[in-house]
Amino acid sequence: MERYKGTFAFQKDIGRVRVTNEDQCSVALNSYGDVFLCVCDGMGGQNKGDYASKMAIDSMMEDFRSMPWTPTFLLRNFLGRCYKKANSAIYEEAARNPLYRDMGTTCVCALIRGNKILVGNAGDSRAYSYSRDTLRLTRLTEDQTYVDYLYRTGKIQESEISSRADRHVLMNALGIFPSASFDIKVYPYSGESILLCSDGLYNNLSEAEIKAVLSTADRSDEKCAFFISEANANGGSDNIAVALWEVLPHD
């Protein structure tokens, strides 16, 4: 099984408009050679969104770090349990404490092992892969929003999405319902760069601009810092979170 050597970085920023930062991000590796990235974007206002995203990412990262050896064919089940556990923790805290009522969070994650990558998603944070060989940027997730649903069902055109006032309305997030709803997809992996981000990045940078940054020879931490800088330069309309994994070139 291929075990890739790589570098990673993650960074979050409050942006230029919001008064609190409700985004969270992290990356970790374990002794089995697995790589795990996670980005969460909280919702609910005041301190609710911040608390929900912190609960989610702490739960997801702790589950990854404490994961016993798990055969590759069972990793999908493992990720599902991670999502269910995080969802229950947030939902139960919101039900118990009126201060946190209606809080929730998006949660996108990527688990890389050998020649496979598993991508989990609840909400509208995104995962991308970028191939240095083909110079291709590929989105690995679908936004779970009302307008994306309208687009997928043929009720609106793709060109209409960015101009709609309801384009940020989520149809799914962790902590909103007692039962978790999430997507988990499995893709082949051959050393592509993996970027996870909140909507504060992709609403302020086009996919062409994201691809241009990933194609540079800059270090991973420099790319993350540049993503933040450019998103703020383009308005910084929301919190921004990015997590990046890049495989080192072979000698």
Label for each model-derived stretch:
Residues 1-251:
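PP2C/PPM-type serine/threonine phosphatase catalytic domain
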